[in-house]
């Protein structure tokens, strides 16, 4: 969810940026995941298309959305007797929506895909809250959710700070990047 939001926000911010700034703006997005080495090995220089493809679809990227959703589905299947049927239905539905998404449409408008993933993730969290007994398993899910959020927040701040600190303080690009940071 956080990764797709980051992609959509930065995609829109970089549309308004100068061409050279837009080209440089994609690298920090990969840096948020900590997979810049793998990205460079596969693609070389970051472009909008290569970053979106890497972060959403590339099966070699363990942090790609498709990889995360696939693992979540496999994990849910392995504990299916301990989760509610609604939880299984939500994660399964999200898996098929991500797997079957029109990749060309996503490349043109990552925002719609971000909404799809966000709705799937939040729907899963909602049915978890309302259908799972609030015991150890529930607390484990909540702990994982909060750890993931804290990790992504610190990575986003570090990557954006490194990029923004190299820009002139008065440039419009700095303002665009600060707005993107707040929306991420």
Features from the language model and the residues they span:
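Alpha-helical transmembrane segments and their helix-helix packing motifs
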Residues: 2-184
């Amino acid at each position: 969810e956080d990764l797709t939001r980051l992609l959509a926000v930065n995609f829109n911010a970089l549309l308004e940026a100068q061409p050279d700034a837009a080209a440089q703006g994609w690298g920090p997005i990969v840096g948020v995941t900590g997979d810049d080495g793998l990205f460079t090995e596969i693609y070389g220089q970051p472009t909008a298309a290569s970053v979106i493809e890497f972060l959403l679809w590339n099966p070699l990227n363990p942090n790609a959305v498709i990889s995360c959703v696939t693992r979540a589905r496999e994990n849910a299947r392995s504990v299916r007797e301990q989760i509610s049927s609604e939880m299984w239905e939500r994660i399964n539905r999200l898996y098929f929506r991500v797997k079957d998404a029109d990749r060309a449409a996503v490349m043109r408008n990552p925002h719609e895909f971000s909404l799809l993933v966000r709705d799937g993730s939040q729907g899963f969290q909602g049915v978890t809250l309302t259908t799972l007994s609030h015991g150890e398993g529930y607390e484990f899910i909540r702990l994982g959710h909060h750890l993931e959020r804290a990790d992504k927040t610190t990575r986003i701040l570090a990557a954006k700070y490194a990029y923004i600190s190299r820009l002139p303080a008065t440039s419009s690009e700095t303002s665009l990047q600060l707005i993107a940071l707040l929306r991420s």
